[in-house]
């Protein structure tokens, strides 16, 4: 309990704790840096959604699904099934490239939303599709240049084992 109180007065402590936990689980420093950045970008997006009146819960989940389906060609549920996840966090099981493209999709959605200021949920759904499409284009180009799929069944357990 003291740790949590300390973190409330100094939020950097909670970031340090998360960093330590990821390291203990075997994640690379590079992946951890990407993951922490993805948390920041997600927070900026959800702040933007709140600003334009999107409701937490079902509406956030719907917009997240639209973004993910657009850039990854899979709903969040389909993506979790591909990676063999049950309750685990999807972002904690993305490769660096998947995380980066997800961040691009979410940051693009936030930027487009700020630019056009959607007035209702239906307009926010269109914005989510546009933001996801920015990352979809990047993903398609990367896959064409490398000959490799970006969206894979690789999960944290697999890429930590491969690192060892």
Name the predicted role of every residue range:
Residues 1-164:
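Positively charged, phosphate-engaging catalytic surfaces used for nucleic-acid and nucleotide handling
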């Amino acid at each position: 309990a003291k740790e949590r109180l300390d973190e409330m007065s100094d939020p950097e402590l909670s970031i340090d704790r998360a960093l330590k936990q990821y390291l203990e689980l075997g994640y690379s420093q590079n992946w951890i840096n990407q993951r922490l950045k993805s948390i920041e970008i997600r927070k900026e997006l959800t702040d933007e959604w709140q600003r334009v009146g999107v409701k937490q819960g079902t509406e956030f989940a719907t917009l997240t699904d639209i973004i993910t389906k657009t850039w990854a060609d899979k709903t969040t549920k389909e993506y979790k099934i591909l990676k063999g996840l049950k309750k685990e966090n999807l972002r904690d099981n993305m490769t660096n490239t998947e995380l980066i493209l997800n961040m691009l999709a979410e940051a693009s959605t936030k930027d487009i939303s700020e630019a056009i200021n959607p007035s209702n949920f239906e307009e926010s759904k269109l914005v989510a599709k546009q933001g996801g499409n920015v990352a979809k284009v990047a993903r398609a180009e990367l896959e064409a240049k490398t000959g490799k799929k970006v969206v894979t069944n690789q999960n944290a357990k697999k890429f930590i084992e491969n690192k060892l």
